[in-house]
Amino acid sequence: VMVTKNETETLMEEAIGEKISDYLTKPVNPSQVLIAVKKLIEGRKILGTKTSQEYIQQFNEISRMLLNPMDLEEWTSLYRRLVESEFELDQHPELGLQQTVTDQRRESNQEFCKFVERNYKGWLENPDIVLSPHVVDKYVFPHLNTPGPVFFFVIDCMRYDQWLVMEQHLQDLFTIKKDFYTGILPSATPYARNAIFSGYFPSDIERVLPGLWSTGEDDDYSMNKNEKELLEKLLERRRIRLRTELKYYKIIDPEYGKQMVGNIASFAKNHVTAIVVNFVDMLAHSRSDTPILK
């Protein structure tokens, strides 16, 4: 902790550059010193206690919510609270609450499955529910009237907790707005991702665009080989003309991802660039075969 009479900005910047923990300017009263010392010595303990208290309160609130009927928006809110609290508690393993979180998540999953079974059929006819085929219309096309390039990333099999980690690295570079949509069933890649790019449900792709729908005899990855063409057909149906040719890339391993980073400046010339990040999905499917990933 640096205590000084000097209030010049250059000294403050130099002190920050030296990674000081706190900066106090004279005259200093005892309460300032006390809070600086407590933050350094007991800060983690105090934060852990506060986190524990907030989680216990949330645990009780979620337990009450699970006893009552909820709509999709309330379930989404519950899911966010569960994941975000788990994310916070991961920073404080000394609290010993991980098993409690796991148990409540399991109970929530069971109740949510029942909720989906009761309501999924109705969602298919509800225009207020954003499903996989509606993603591009709702979240991508509205940006096409802007003068700059539009990048559409699909990170297959990424969980919300994984996004929270990524978000920490992006929030200083971008203005981030989070929203949620409801995935279709089956949620497997060949169905869900084709639905996103085509704007159709899988049965409609097979009926309207049979040449772009692969049979179930193919593997999961070849069943998604026509995503660029499906997106082009969706643009045609919406009578949208791009300023440049649609660009589509699929990142199947980190090395190819690094190559794309090296060429990122050239992508700025494109009107729309769609990028599928596939290696997260491949990694998830490899867990059962790779001991280190278990």
How would you label these PLM feature ranges?
Residues 6-22:
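Alpha4 helix (beta4-alpha4-beta5 surface) of REC/receiver domains from two-component response regulators
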Residues 8-9, 159-163, 281-285:
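Flexible loop/turn segments at secondary-structure boundaries
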Residues 10, 37-51:
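The C-terminal output helix
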Residues 28-37:
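C-terminal output helix
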Residues 47-118, 124, 128, 168-175, ...:
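His/Asp/Glu-rich, glycine-adjacent segments
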Residues 128-191:
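Segments forming glycine/polar-rich beta-alpha architectures that bind adenosine-containing cofactors
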